[in-house]
A protein has these predicted regions:
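Short, small/polar-rich motifs associated with maturation and membrane association
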Residues: 1-259, 264-273, 318, 332-334, ...
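Extracellular/periplasmic, surface-exposed regions of secreted and cell-surface proteins
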Residues: 98, 210-213, 248, 254-260, ...
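Conserved small-residue
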Residues: 160-195, 420-422, 621, 638-748, ...
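Acidic, glycine-rich flexible loop segments
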Residues: 284-319
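Glycine-rich, aromatic-lined ligand/substrate-binding cores of catalytic
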Residues: 749-781
Length: 899
């Protein structure tokens, strides 16, 4: 393998510059287009760019690799507990913002993708333009991620192993008062305090050196006519927080068989995973308690009991909180079979079938020393999916004409069910959640179940015509019929049209050797979104409302929970894009740029309606609209390319602007509109000691998720050396009003305006170095942690940050005082490796590596970390609300060997 390590120089916006690319319908039955003729942008992330030190999650492998794709995973904002991906921004308020995931032709989701073992992934292909996603119809509005896993090569028997072991060390945490500082501050301020005689750093007490190990073993063999591949992966991660960790076991088998003179090809695959996560019941309570606990208290039990400060009702002894449990077990299974038959040189047909099963178990336990009566919860959720697809593909070249076409049909059926129960009144904490019968009471509504069985039928067709090898037009249409929309809108149709011009093949440019590629492209298409609709959204539905006595027997009463809306239909996203791709000097320098504008219409929103005439006070209707526009720029350069040395630099930049256009319109002759200003997120949970707490808002005419805050002119003395925030009377009416409609102004947005991803790879003989950097700019973060931890009105019952006693602020109302720039540049990983020279023998290649993940973050943000949830629209968006999970760095060693 000496000198043969190939550094991928793919464009992060990228074109696979020489290989053909596949435009795939939902089951990968497809027609092949030459990349240079492709009117849209398909972003391919190849295997070399997925090697990022310790990668515990396939989503982490994708982060920063392609422009306009933002990944929020548990590895970034651990307190938000998100596994989400946004492709070119948020497109809906009610849901369906995660992209459609296709794993080896099987429809899936981001949660399942997170369980795929990273080393099993051959490549990611991200589809962003509607001219590409229209083939996915009602589920393509938020983009599509195609995942291709590794298959047999047909080169005889091979064995490969990849392993990685690492340690996690805390590198940054909240600096709270120690015992001596705590006592000195209380005495200086003349406050009564409890002194138990200890000096405890509770943050260090609940943490440890984290350990992570990944092991991956793969077998493959056979011939080009009959081959197989089997792989097994295992991840064991004991996190930096005591008692928290997870394990993921993955197994996968793929078999390919050809027959009848290679005219028939059969592909069969089986995938299974088991993911077990051990967590605690209330993470925010744990971290706030560890920070705010009186440092003179002990960490361990005293005489068999936890020592608790009765005056601090919002915290508990951190050691007691670590006994809580919130455990999950996710099981996934999939089997799929694809048969393809070449009827002639130009015509082929294929059939694809898949079955998927998933189960999720969630078990929770909260002991009586945390909650007076304790709490138990057990839930089990299952889903099954059947998918069938048939397709015909035609391809013919005659003279200067090249035509590729496809037509197909698809049917998908899902069945989802769940059951859960909760109880309290625990008499014995030793059994945890394993014996729910020891609990004395079952709260009303704590036991429930659900069931839904949506189905989707589809027809699709597409064609690609190329003239003279340089002028290309591509058209497609897909029709989806869903059981979840209203009867009058069962079918939705999603067309697309795109054009491209390969200028390099023009006579006047063909002989200019310095220009390897020059292409212009544009396209328009429509795609749909069903994410905001459930199986029974179009119907009047009821649920249990209470218990009354009828004839001396307890009887459950029922009440309305939803108005029916037979006019519910798809949200529709229309996108127009125009772009250019340039390659110079044999593609040692590749540049790409694309502008896009998309508009979501018929956007779903839950409107307030009068009762009567409606039976319920909310109505879900298709009335709103939202836009996204942006510019994506990328380049890939190879400044050094020699036998013993090579340097590649890849970079992508994305500018993105979102705007909530309208939430007003008519429904059956009735004018409907949402409130001008609606709170989306605020400070909550442990550590919120009163005050106005709404921070992030939804405002028509603004980006979704803006900071709408009072303006603080500074601090003002209020007596006894205390300070409060000096809030400006913005409307000049003589009264400061902190409510949602009061003295507030739009102070910035939570979503970054610009994102950056960059990868640098360098090889010198058998040594190599790889560096990944990601960044986000142009957004704000509200430091709710700083607000809470500097609030001296709760001291000394609750500990505070170093420096807080000197500021002596006794105010917890929100304002722009705690709003900061969220810009950052993070060095995600640095890897140094060595390819051991192998001359002869059983071993074909051997690679050793050392990696550091989360090497450094350059930022002006004063909080713990700027890498919080800045993309997913929920109550945590843009808010650092006591999300004080320690920042840690991972040091790891890797081994890769092939036989």
């Amino acid at each position: 393998m000496k000198h043969k390590r190939r550094f991928i120089c793919r464009m992060i916006c990228a074109l696979a510059l020489s290989a053909p690319l596949v435009v795939k319908a939902q089951s990968e039955q497809s027609f092949v287009l030459d990349t240079l003729h492709l009117p849209g942008t398909m972003n391919v992330v190849e295997p070399e760019l997925l090697k990022k030190g310790v990668v515990n999650n396939a989503l982490d492998a994708l982060n920063g690799q392609t422009a306009g794709v933002n990944v929020t995973s548990n590895g970034l904002d651990r307190m938000a507990m998100l596994n989400s991906v946004r492709v070119r921004g948020t497109t809906s308020i009610m849901g369906g913002n995660d992209p459609l995931v296709i794993i080896d032709g099987v429809t899936s989701d981001v949660a399942t993708l997170a369980t795929i073992y990273p080393a099993d992934i051959e490549s990611f292909t991200v589809l962003k333009n509607a001219s590409e996603t229209a083939l996915y119809g009602s589920r393509g509005a938020s983009g599509v991620i195609q995942v291709k896993t590794k298959k047999g090569t047909g080169r005889g028997f091979q064995i490969s192993y990849e392993g990685n072991c690492g340690l996690e060390a805390m590198c940054k945490s909240m600096e709270m008062l120690n015992a001596a500082e705590y006592i000195a501050a209380a005495q200086k301020l003349g406050l009564e305090y409890n002194d138990k005689g200890y000096n405890t750093n509770f943050r260090k007490a609940i943490t440890r050196t984290g350990q992570v190990q990944n092991h991956y073993l793969a077998f493959s063999g056979g011939t080009p006519h009959s081959n197989y591949r089997a792989s097994f992966g295992y991840i064991d991660h004991n996190t930096i927080i005591r008692s928290k960790g997870y394990r993921n076991l993955v197994a996968k088998i793929d078999v390919t068989q050809k027959a009848f003179g290679d005219r028939l090809t059969g592909d069969f695959g089986v995938f299974g995973s088991s993911f077990k996560n051990n967590d605690i019941f209330d993470n925010q309570m744990l971290f706030y308690s560890a920070d705010a606990m009186n440092p003179t208290y002990p960490y361990d039990r005293v005489n068999g009991s936890w020592l608790k400060n009765g005056s601090a009702s919002q915290i508990n002894p951190p050691g007691a909180l670590l006994v809580e449990r919130n455990d999950t077990k996710n099981m996934n299974f999939n089997a799929h079979l694809k048969l393809s038959y070449d009827i002639s040189k130009d015509l082929s047909v294929s059939g694809f079938g898949a079955y998927s099963y998933a189960s999720n178990e969630n078990d929770q336990f909260c002991p009586t020393w945390v909650w007076a009566q304790g709490n138990l919860y057990r839930g089990e959720f299952k889903s099954e999916e059947w998918l069938a697809n048939v397709q015909a593909n035609y391809q013919h070249v005659w003279g200067i004409h090249d035509l590729k076409a496809m037509a197909g049909a698809e049917y998908q059926k899902d069945v989802r069910s769940g059951f859960w129960t909760s109880a309290k009144g625990i008499t014995n904490n030793d059994m945890g959640y394993h014996n729910i019968g020891v609990a004395a009471s079952r709260p009303f509504g704590g036991t429930d179940s659900n069931y839904e069985d949506p189905s989707l039928a589809s027809v699709m067709a597409g064609a690609d015509y190329t003239l003279l090898g340089r002028y290309a037009v591509s058209v497609s249409v897909r029709g989806d019929g869903s059981s979840m929309v209203g009867d009058d809108h069962t079918w939705g149709f999603f067309p697309s049209l795109s054009l491209s011009w390969n200028m390099k093949r023009e006579k006047w440019l063909r002989h200019i050797d310095d220009i390897t590629m020059l292409k212009l492209r544009t396209g328009y298409g429509r795609s749909g979104n069903l994410g905001g609709i459930s199986s029974y959204t179009t119907m009047n539905t009821v649920r249990q409302n209470g218990i009354v006595s009828i004839n001396s027997s307890p009887t459950v009463t029922m009440g309305m929970i939803r108005n029916n809306n037979p006019d519910l239909k798809w949200e529709t996203r229309s996108t127009w894009n125009i772009g250019a791709d340039v390659g110079l000097w044999n593609n040692r320098l590749v540049m790409t740029a694309e502008y896009y504008y998309s508009k979501t219409t018929d956007m779903l929103y839950a409107y307030d309606v009068p009762v009567p005439p409606f039976a319920y006070d909310k109505l879900l209707a298709n009335i709103g609209s939202m836009s996204n526009q942006g510019l994506e720029i990328g380049f890939s350069v190879t400044p050094v390319q020699k036998k013993d040395m090579e340097l590649n630099i890849n970079m992508n930049l994305a500018w993105q602007k979102n705007k909530l256009l309208s939430l007003s319109g008519e429904y059956e002759g009735m004018q409907m509109s949402a409130a001008d200003v609606t709170a989306m997120g605020g400070l909550s949970g442990a550590g919120q000691h009163g005050g106005y707490n709404n921070v992030v808002y939804q405002i028509v005419g603004q980006p979704l998720g803006v900071f709408y805050l009072p303006h603080c002119k500074g601090l003002v003395v209020v007596g006894n050396g205390h300070y409060r925030y000096d809030i400006e009377d913005l409307d000049r009416n003589g009264t400061v009003d902190l409510s949602d409609g009061g003295d507030r102004y739009i102070a910035g947005q939570a979503t970054p305006k610009v994102t950056l991803g960059s990868n640098v790879s360098f090889r010198y003989r058998d040594w190599y170095l790889s560096l990944q950097m990601n960044g986000a700019f142009g957004h704000k973060i509200f430091d709710g942690t700083g607000l809470a931890y500097n609030n001296m009105s709760s001291f000394p019952d609750y500990n505070v940050l170093k420096g807080a006693p000197e500021k002596n602020i006794v105010d917890q109302n929100v304002s722009d005082y705690w709003l900061e720039n969220g810009d950052y540049l993070n060095i995600e990983y640095l890897t140094v490796g060595y390819d051991v020279p192998i001359k002869k023998g059983v071993v074909k290649s051997l690679r050793l590596s050392l990696s550091v993940n989360n090497l450094a973050t350059i930022t002006g943000y004063s909080g713990l970390t700027p890498m919080i949830n800045s993309y997913v629209v929920n109550s945590t968006m843009g808010i650092d609300d006591k999300r004080t999970y320690p920042v840690y760095r991972t040091y790891s060693m890797g081994l890769s060997i092939q036989f």
